[in-house]
């Protein structure tokens, strides 16, 4: 009999405003506001102030699922919510009349149920104050013709298809990037167990994504990234940014600068081990508490991902570390009795040149059932380590795309700021590390411990349940469904008093016509 675990998440809204501080620095600050719990709580995976030259954008921590910020787009500008994504280079917004589709006809195999069209529109677009992209009467809106479409499939199986457009991106209330290129997503495939995105702000380095033509033929192209476009317009000097999140859900995304007040101890710049992913070498994972210390030597790649909630460790390592912590296992979740958590207990991640990030076990608690605390450490069948949001709450990270370097430091929860703009290839305050793995074979696990480990015990938690969203919709394998152009036009005119105009209807009709011609709708 399957035992379900109920995980209680708080829903946190972060209010943001993009501020330009001059000469290439932009900044986004977080202000945390707590909202009632969502009816549906979703799990990402089952294993799974200011010198000149700085720019900033605000971010939101959504239910321990992902960070969001707002982009002000169009003339007049409208604010749209987007998830921060370190793994994808392209930025896109969901269209207000988004439709669900099944990409199986493209040879993409999916199983299980998915979010329906009605569910996507209700969840993503129902709030007028935080709606989806309307294709409204923006005087700066125009289509991109080569290529005209984009198609993205994420590693969690979320799949989106849409058109490439340009519009004005505003910041500091009066300045703008006039021809900001991004995508408008018209079709989405979202598994029922996943949380759909209202949009994505891609912060990965430039890499190819797909386009799909009228005959469903998929090709590739390299879209201009968000950071590349800011550099091209001399808003930033270099494609570089940093991220900080404290233990209360507040934080900032800082473009073109390092905030030296947000870390303590060493700030070490590590060479990326992957060209198209933010990954570095990790040398060991250590566990310590008030009575003992254990070290696990394992040289492998560690990926920084904001679209992941948990910290994923190779299975053997995950079980060994959690065993040392005294955790037990139930339905794939590691757990501890809440009243027995050692406040001195922590995981320490060691990177190159002995740089370390300490993550207290108490900050790994993702939910509680009675006296049982569930932990955000997940075993994975992969040999790599994935560092999700629970890691970012303890680390200040900086990414220099030109140098292919990632600098890390232990997060220091400080309300002040001390910004240093990036004016060359140098990372202010950082020690450059040139260490490369030599002593231990890749992914080999070697334990040194001050005590004898015991086996993990599996227990049954009879009073607990998993609250999992399940859609009743399972779309058949077919081509992306067509829009009803006539109905869209009627809706646009009927809603003219709510941000629509005759031009809105015309723009939407043009978008639909373009997609019909391309075979996308």
From Swiss-Prot:
The entry's keywords: Aspartyl protease, Cell wall, Endoplasmic reticulum, Glycoprotein, Hydrolase, Membrane, Protease, Secreted, Signal, Transmembrane, Transmembrane helix
Protein's name according to its UniProt entry: Aspartic proteinase yapsin-1
Extracellular-side positions: 18-500
Gene that this sequence comes from: yps1
Subcellular location: Endoplasmic reticulum membrane; Secreted, Cell wall
Organism domain of life: Eukaryota
GO MF entry, a single one: aspartic-type endopeptidase activity
Glycosylated sites: 136, 157, 250, 289, 295, 354, 414, 418, 460, 484
Topology relative to the membrane: Single-pass membrane protein
Pfam families, alphabetized: Asp (PF00026)
């Amino acid at each position: 009999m399957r035992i379900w675990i109920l995980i209680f998440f708080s829903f946190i809204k972060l209010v943001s405003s993009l501020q330009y501080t001059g000469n290439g620095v932009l900044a986004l600050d977080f202000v945390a506001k707590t909202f009632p719990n969502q009816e549906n709580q979703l799990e990402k995976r089952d294993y799974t102030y200011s010198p000149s030259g700085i720019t900033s954008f605000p971010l939101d921590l959504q239910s321990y699922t992902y960070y969001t910020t707002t982009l002000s787009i169009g003339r007049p500008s409208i604010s749209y919510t987007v998830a921060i994504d370190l793994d994808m280079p392209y930025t896109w917004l969901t269209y207000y009349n988004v439709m669900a589709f099944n990409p199986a006809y493209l040879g993409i195999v999916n199983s299980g149920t998915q979010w329906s069209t009605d569910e996507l529109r209700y969840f993503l677009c129902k709030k007028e104050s935080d709606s989806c992209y309307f294709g409204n009467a923006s005087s700066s809106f125009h289509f991109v013709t080569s290529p005209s479409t984009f198609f993205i499939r994420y590693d969690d199986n979320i799949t989106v298809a849409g058109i490439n457009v340009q519009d004005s991106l505003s910041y500091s209330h009066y300045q703008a990037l006039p021809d900001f290129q991004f995508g408008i997503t018209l079709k989405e495939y979202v598994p029922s167990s996943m949380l759909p995105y209202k949009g994505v702000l891609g912060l990965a380095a430039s890499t190819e994504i797909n386009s799909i033509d009228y005959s469903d033929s998929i090709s590739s192209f390299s879209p201009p990234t968000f950071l590349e476009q800011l550099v091209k317009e001399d808003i930033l000097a270099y494609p570089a940014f940093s991220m900080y999140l404290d233990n209360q859900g507040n934080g900032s995304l800082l473009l073109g600068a390092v905030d030296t007040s947000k870390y303590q101890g060493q700030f070490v710049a590590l060479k990326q081990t992957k060209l198209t992913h933010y990954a570095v070498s990790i040398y060991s994972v250590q566990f310590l508490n008030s009575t003992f210390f254990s070290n696990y030597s394992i040289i492998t790649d560690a990926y920084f991902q904001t679209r992941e909630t948990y910290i994923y460790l190779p299975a053997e390592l995950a079980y060994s570390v959690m065993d040392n912590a005294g955790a037990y296992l139930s339905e794939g979740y590691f757990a501890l009795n809440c009243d027995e958590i050692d406040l001195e207990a922590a995981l320490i991640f060691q990177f190159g040149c002995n740089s370390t990030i300490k993550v207290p076990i108490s900050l790994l608690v993702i939910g509680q059932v009675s006296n049982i605390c569930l932990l955000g450490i997940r075993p994975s069948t992969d040999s790599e380590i994935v560092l999700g949001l629970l890691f970012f709450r303890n680390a200040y990270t900086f990414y220099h795309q030109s140098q292919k370097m990632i600098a890390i430091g232990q997060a220091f929860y400080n309300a002040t700021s001390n910004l240093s703009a990036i004016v060359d290839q140098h990372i202010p305050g950082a020690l450059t590390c040139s260490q490369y793995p030599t002593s231990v074979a890749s992914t080999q696990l070697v334990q040194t411990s001050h005590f004898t480990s015991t086996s993990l015990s599996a227990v049954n938690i009879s009073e607990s349940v998993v609250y999992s969203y399940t859609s009743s919709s399972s779309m058949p394998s077919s081509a992306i469904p067509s829009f009803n152009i006539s109905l869209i036009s009627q809706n646009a005119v009927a809603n003219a008093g709510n941000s629509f105009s005759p031009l809105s209807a015309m723009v939407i009709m043009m978008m639909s016509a373009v997609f019909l011609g391309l075979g996308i709708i």
